């Protein structure tokens, strides 16, 4: 759906419903960024699996469709829409947001 949505993750599974946009010309609210997700899967000696998830917000900066990780974006002069995107992602992800 081109927008960041909540995800489910615990030690037994990870479900990502929507990571938003990575590279897109959609400049309206909720569609101007996304998430990069890193999932680590570990198989234990007893056969049990465990998972961990890190999701990093990214902003699609113009011109040139540059994908900017949030920690870099915080140091740049980006449009006001960037700050709004950060707020929206924090609201959607709640405690899972860094």
Regions found by a protein language model. Name each.
Residues 32, 36-98:
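A short C-terminal boundary segment appended to hydrolase-like catalytic domains
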Residues 1-37:
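Conserved beta-sheet core of the metallophosphoesterase superfamily
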């Amino acid at each position: 759906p081109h927008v960041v949505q909540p995800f489910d993750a615990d030690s037994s599974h990870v479900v990502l419903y929507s990571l938003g946009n990575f590279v897109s010309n959609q400049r309206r609210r909720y569609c101007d960024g996304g998430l990069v997700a890193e999932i680590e899967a570990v198989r234990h000696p007893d056969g049990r699996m465990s998972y961990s998830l890190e999701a990093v917000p990214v902003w699609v900066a113009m011109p040139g469709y540059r994908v900017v990780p949030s920690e870099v974006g915080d140091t740049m002069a980006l449009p006001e829409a960037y700050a709004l995107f950060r707020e929206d992602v924090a609201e959607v992800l709640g405690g899972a947001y860094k």
